[in-house]
Amino acid sequence: MTTRGIRVWVRLGAAALAVGGAVLAAQQPQTQPSPQQPQRPRERVSEDGGRLERVGPTMSRVVPDNTPYDQWLAQAKARTPIFSGHVIDDARTVALKPWPDMGVDGLYIRMADYQIIDGFVLEIPPHGQTRPQRHMFEEGIYFFGGPGHTIIQQEGRRPERVDWKARSLFAVPLNVKYQHFNDGDKPVRLLAVTSFPFMLNTTDSVKFVYENPFEFRDRYNAQEDYLRRNDHLGPNQTVTNVVPDALEFKLDAYERRGKNTTNMHWRMGGDTMVDFHVSEMPGGVYKRAHRHSSDAFILLLSGEGYSLTWKEGAEKRTRVDWHEGTVFVPPIYWYHQHLNPGKTPARYLAINAPTLVSRLGLRFEDQIEKDPPEIEQEFAREVARRGGTVKKEP
């Protein structure tokens, strides 16, 4: 194998395995967090591999260093407005700046130290449009307003119109030319989540990502039923390419995460790098804590509540208060738990990469089956403060 070939395989490891939060010391899931353990210092793994970081007594991950995506970010700052952090309080009102590459105001979102998925917010002016785009990464888009439409077109094929409104979700077919149009008299915002970091880390070529003529006709071939498909395959599984209203879509029971909770996983656009699911909790209910080895964007669609996130074994937990429009992410392989102390249901959309992680042979998630008393006690206080009742599991 040539030196170039060796480097490509190293990049694949960094992009697909290490940066996805690869579990280097995985053991059986715990039923409760273990006592606080002293954190070991980060250790150098290799020139291309990054640093070893302990994320708990039983877990380690590789923190990538100077990846192709990191290098792209450093150069993009000159012409791209960039947000870096863990929480955007409200994507509907967060400050935006002119983004020449998109043709409208926007904000690129780099969450945590993620290296698989990224995001961005755009605002299309009344009766305006974005610049046409085409790329070799998957993309899911949630629209905060409307009406509007998106034109998608394969080379040499007829254009197709995708109509959307507030709360619509659409997966752009891979490497198809597309452009968004605002048909209304008010500005429209959208949130997009993509697999751009993973593709760039894997190929180390911006030209490959943005100037590739290959057509994925097995995914999209301008077929007449593409936009109408809505096949419910079984509990919590639906194949579709457009969700007209993510807040009204009927969900299935999902008691694995807790009694009275519901959920639906959408397989959209033939995507294999990003996955979509929506979950709902009634008032007075919270979901079981879990952690996973991939990036995950969480967008609140309705309700008010909070989430907790923490490293395995940590006594101190970080609290994120949320409401409609909040976007937040848990750090790789940190536990996180969503709680609804209000009286009305809370629904959220999560976009992550379980299929990608699983196909690499990695364990995707762990779950804590029994909560520590302090979480239950805090939740009971929050529910009481709002005049509600905790719905206990039998």
Name every feature range the model reports, one short phrase each.
Residues P125-P126, H135-E155, G283, H292-E312:
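Glycine- and acidic-residue-biased ligand/ion/polar-headgroup-sensing regions
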Residues T2-G13:
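Bacterial N-terminal signal peptides that target proteins for export
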Residues R11-A22:
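Bacterial N-terminal signal peptides
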Residues Q28, P33-Q115, S205-M273, H277, ...:
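A short, N-terminal "cap"/entry segment at the start of jelly-roll beta-barrel domains
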